[in-house]
Amino acid sequence: MAQGWAGFSEEELRRLKQNKDPFEPQRRLPVKKTRQQLQREKALLEQSQKLGLQDGSASLLPEQLLSTPKQRASSQKPPPSSPAVPSPLTLTSSTGDGELHGGESQLQEPGLENSHHGSRSAEIQTPKPDCKVEKKKMELQEKSRWEVLQQEQRLMEEKNKRKKALLAQAIAERSRRTQAETMKLKRIQKELQALDDMVSADIGILRNRIDQASLEYSYARKRFDRAEAEYVTAKLDLQRKTETKEQLTEHLCTIIQQNELRKAQKLEELMRQLDVQADDEALELELEVEQLLREQEAEAARQMAPVERLSQPDGEGVSSELTEENKEPQKPATSPETDKSGKCCSSSPRRLDCPDPGAQNFPAAVAT
């Protein structure tokens, strides 16, 4: 029971499916031919021998013939004595790797299906072909396959050569680009280095100047600190001296005031002892005493002014003024009208000389 093509059995179809090349899916391995195919090939060979081709194509198998002999063979009509034998075109299409589908289409035609039983009877009558022809045919098929493989290999080699050339060209172009980029980068790096050198030189000069300025600033700061310390000490010393001066002036004023009080008391005691009755003389004495007191107060005020100014530190002027003032009251005292008054007046200048030691000690105190 043949389900597909009548020329193959189910076992042969399974074998064909199992023997497919995984690396070459488009090509099929050579398959054992049936008796019908062998008979057709044998008839084709006989026909070619009868025709007697002059170009030597009769010695070759139909698969190895070029297009021109195939066209000639297809153009020639089959002899009327063999109606069961198909034309060479159908035989050539039924053989080879990619010719199985053509044979199947021819066998499935309605005319061939009707003559199927007649071909079987012819197969029984015809003898088996020689094994040598089949071997030659297989060798030729292998050679043709080898040539195809060689051609494919050559094509692949050419493609690889082209790819290598393109790759080398791309590499050369890329290398040129990289060289140009490296040159640009080197130039930019040199420019940056030059800028860095200029900036570093300027920075070095500025740093040296900054160091020098910082040293000068430190020296000036030290001098300022010393001057400030001296100023503070001088100010404190000035304050102490002013305090001592004020204390001395106050002491001088108190001494002068006490001296004047003592003088007044002494004069009163002398007047009581003498019991002066004359009113005129008493009035004159009182006037003289008041005048002396006023002069002493004015002198004390004049002495306070130069002490505060500190323009005349020595006390020679003060002592001279005190001596002059002490001499001035002696003039009216030297001309008394009576002996009592002369005694009193003679004793008064002696009492007026009492503040002289205090006045003499004043310049020494101020100098200290």
From Swiss-Prot:
Domain of life from the UniProt record: Eukaryota
GO CC term (a single one): nucleolus
UniProt record, GO biological process: hair follicle morphogenesis; non-motile cilium assembly; positive regulation of smoothened signaling pathway
Organism from which the protein derives: Rattus norvegicus (Rat)
Annotated region described as Disordered, given as residue ranges: 1-138, 298-368
Biased composition, class Basic and acidic residues, residue ranges: 11-27, 129-138
Subunit text: Interacts with RCHY1, RAB6A/RAB6 and SCYL1.
Family statement: Belongs to the GORAB family.
Coiled coil: 145-304
Localization per record: Cytoplasm; Golgi apparatus
Compositional bias of kind Pro residues: 77-86
Protein name per the record: RAB6-interacting golgin
Necessary for interaction with RCHY1: annotated segments: 188-368
Keyword vocabulary terms for this entry: Coiled coil, Cytoplasm, Golgi apparatus
Keyword Cytoplasm: yes
Higher taxonomy: Eukaryota, Metazoa, Chordata, Craniata, Vertebrata
The UniProt record lists the keyword Transmembrane: no
InterPro entries assigned to the protein according to its UniProt record, in alphabetical order: GORAB
